[in-house]
Curated annotation (Swiss-Prot):
Protein name: Uroporphyrinogen decarboxylase
Gene Ontology molecular-function annotations: uroporphyrinogen decarboxylase activity
Organism name: Sorangium cellulosum (strain So ce56) (Polyangium cellulosum (strain So ce56))
Gene designation per UniProt: hemE
Keyword terms, alphabetized: Cytoplasm, Decarboxylase, Lyase, Porphyrin biosynthesis
Catalytic activity: uroporphyrinogen III + 4 H(+) = coproporphyrinogen III + 4 CO2
Length: 349
């Protein structure tokens, strides 16, 4: 197997820095846009053969890992909170959950029953990859999932989410407990189906203060991540705008800590500790900059990592649809062209 990515997750030396990108399969690729002319996003997610096709599409660019094509909100439907993707609006939850009665109605389900198509896709992709490229599974983290449920979709300030968290901590804990159990089971099931690493996406957790994170979120994330340790697969713990939360994220768990572009990678690694691998952290919009600028800034990220074992090159969030494929390929090629040993920095430890 081409295991550069998995070796880096375990902080083992690699020849060059491994690279993959969040949303590496998606609308920036012409072949994906062609597929979307025939199928909706949910149709692709719910059809294992289509999820396989989309998962494999970007690998021609040279990524060191494949990531399952799915959506973090898929568990909401079997939990009893159906949603749709409204054009121009993003996800819309038809019946937001904002009180104890709504929380009580949410179901904790078995993944093979509620999300069997996701696990079928994992099995299909793993078989097709045939050991050539490792497969990453994923799920949304409890706070991000809860914010969608409470807000009814995207939010600019998470006002309703925070109001519930502060006004009724017991109800909030019950909501987070149900989501955490669903996420734990789903990630466990993905590993059993063949995922060789998993990522927990906490896209909106950066809206919280460190105190609120530690009190209202960290225990639930820790529950998931500590359980996953028993599987033996690497777990990537990722959030955006989490510069104030890095130490708390580390304490919650994860083999690898994902870092966004707002915090310099060298400073972030010092804070989480060199006993963890780190992932990141190019600003995704730099892939829309002139190629020379993108390459220069990518090299700067590598230099901040200092050649230390345990760095996985990625973006600070997902690739945006307007990104030129040629620039994505150029950055991947650049990362792979620089021997890790040639980068100045601390020795492996």
């Amino acid at each position: 197997m081409h295991d550069r990515f998995l070796r880096a997750c375990r902080r083992e030396p690699t020849d060059v820095t491994p690279v993959w990108f969040m949303r590496q399969a998606g609308r920036y690729m012409a072949e994906y846009r062609e597929l979307r002319k025939k199928y909706t996003l949910l149709e692709i997610c719910k059809t294992p053969e289509l999820a396989l096709e989309v998962t494999l599409q970007p690998l021609r660019l040279g990524m060191d890992a494949a990531i399952l094509f799915a959506d973090i909100l898929l568990p909401l439907e079997p939990m009893g909170a159906p949603f749709e993707f409204a054009k121009g609006e993003g996800p819309v939850i038809h019946e937001p959950v904002r009180d104890r009665a709504g929380i009580e109605r949410l179901r904790v389900f078995e993944p093979e029953e509620g999300l069997g198509y996701v696990l079928d896709a994992v099995r299909l992709i793993r078989k097709e990859l045939d050991g050539k490229t490792p497969l990453i599974g994923f799920a949304g983290a409890p706070f991000t999932m809860a914010s969608y449920l409470v807000e009814g979709g995207k939010s600019s300030d998470y006002r309703l989410t925070k109001q519930l968290m502060w006004s009724d901590p017991e109800a909030w804990s019950a909501l987070m407990g149900k989501i955490s159990e669903v996420v734990r089971r789903l990630l466990r099931a993905q590993v059993a189906a063949g995922a060789q690493a998993v990522q927990l996406f906490d896209s909106w957790v950066g809206s919280l203060s460190i105190d609120d994170y530690r009190e209202h979120v960290q225990p639930h994330v820790r529950y998931i991540l500590r359980d996953l340790e028993a599987t033996g697969v690497p777990v990537i713990h990722f959030g955006t705008n989490t510069g104030a939360l890095l130490e708390a994220q580390r304490d919650a768990g994860g083999t690898v800590i994902g870092v966004d572009w707002r915090t310099p990678l060298d400073k972030a690694w010092q804070r989480v500790g060199y006993d963890r691998a780190v992932q990141g952290n190019l600003d995704p919009l730099l892939l829309c900059a002139p190629r020379a600028v993108a390459e220069r800034r990518a090299r700067a990220v590598l230099e901040e990592a200092g050649g230390r074992a345990g760095h996985i090159f990625n973006l600070g969030h997902g690739i945006i649809p307007e990104t030129p494929v040629d620039t994505v390929k150029a950055v991947i090629d650049l990362v792979h062209s620089i021997p890790r040993a040639s980068l100045q920095g601390e020795p492996d430890r």
